[in-house]
């Protein structure tokens, strides 16, 4: 019973890392003649106790999988940029347009439990 409870709590409080892409531009180009390959949205989340003690965070080495790091904090802007570089290599992109990043915090029970996320988005160009 204790193992099942621990597994359930781990699943609830685990962070995750996701990469969403869209690549259907219907022939649309950019003003300077470059061709967009895909739009990328990267999210890395973590759960924090008292806004500073990491309970679980997404594993940037395994996006879109249930790869989480318990009791460690992988929630950095640099990790999001590293995932973006890997996606650029995967699709053969040479440039980036409209790069944007933001951090969000959602507190539950005041400051007891916080879900923090870094979001990074960009258009990859050829």
Task: Kindly give the residue locations of the regions a language model identified.
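C-terminal edge-of-domain segments
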Residues: 116-126
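Sec-dependent bacterial lipoprotein signal peptides
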Residues: 1-16
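Bacterial Sec signal peptide processing site at the extreme N-terminus
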Residues: 14-31
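Short, well-ordered alpha-helical segments
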Residues: 33-106
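Short, exposed beta-strand-loop hairpins at the edges of beta-sheets
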Residues: 109-115
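Short secondary-structure capping micro-motifs at structural edges
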Residues: 24-28, 83-85, 108-109
